[in-house]
A protein has these predicted regions:
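A polyanion-binding, active-site-adjacent surface
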Residues: 1-190, 200-203, 211-222
């Protein structure tokens, strides 16, 4: 009997040997697709794989990953609760910033990941993930820790853990934003009937939410 794959598995398979952009020829070891709970209500999206991620084939396994694990725990979450992916699926050489053509090539696959997982809440880590999902050139320090109801999910931008490791003054704001994240999750969680645990039951964004539209208009007006 032929093996049946889920849409997420099909997408991962289609990208296994991806050569759609120049990153495939610039020293990457492998495509780093994503990892976690395929039915997660909460998804985290970073920028791109680093050295350790490229070696192991999973997002956030280096120092930034260890910090992320601590932050998740502070918000009452674990890796098994969430799904983690990056905008860019291949490591840029020397960990440089992604280039626009690379983002444009990879973005459709990120959006397909999000559609397959169907999270209610997406936490974007850093500038690139936030700008890609908001589709606006806006700095993460301006929007971090805020709620953006989009068409299919709620976006919650956060500072990137790697930035906090390189700039120690960002660590406390990052921890504070994870406290806000926990408060938001707690507000929108409901107890499971079979046990004393809680399950995240975040509401879908409301069409025509004028408060969120006004927030975005204020942010992006120039």
């Amino acid at each position: 009997m032929p093996t049946t794959f889920t849409p997420l598995q099909d997408l991962a398979q289609s990208l296994h040997d991806c050569d759609r952009c120049k990153l495939s020829k610039l020293g990457r070891k492998q495509v780093v697709f994503g990892v976690g709970n395929p039915h997660a209500a909460i998804m985290f999206v970073g920028e791109a794989p680093g050295y350790h991620e490229d070696q192991q084939g999973e997002p956030f396994v280096g120092a930034a990953g260890k910090l992320l694990n601590d932050l998740l725990q502070s918000a009452g979450l674990s890796r098994s609760d969430i799904y983690i992916a990056n905008v860019i699926k291949c490591r840029p050489p020397n960990n440089r910033d992604p280039e626009q053509d690379e983002v444009e090539t990879c973005k459709p696959f990120l959006m397909q990941q999000i559609a397959a997982i169907s999270p209610q809440l997406v936490c974007s880590l850093g500038n690139w993930a936030t700008q890609t999902l908001l589709e606006r050139k806006v700095g993460i320090t301006k929007v971090r820790g805020q709620i953006f109801p989009l068409k299919d999910f709620v976006l919650f931008p956060l500072l990137h853990p790697a930035a906090a490791l390189h700039q120690g003054n960002l660590l406390q704001p990052l921890r504070e934003d994870f406290k806000k994240l926990k408060a938001y999750i707690d507000q929108h969680s409901s107890p499971q009937s079979s046990a004393g645990n809680t399950t995240v039951a975040l509401p879908r964004p409301l069409q025509g939410d004028t408060s969120s539209q006004q927030i975005q208009m204020d942010l992006f007006a120039s």
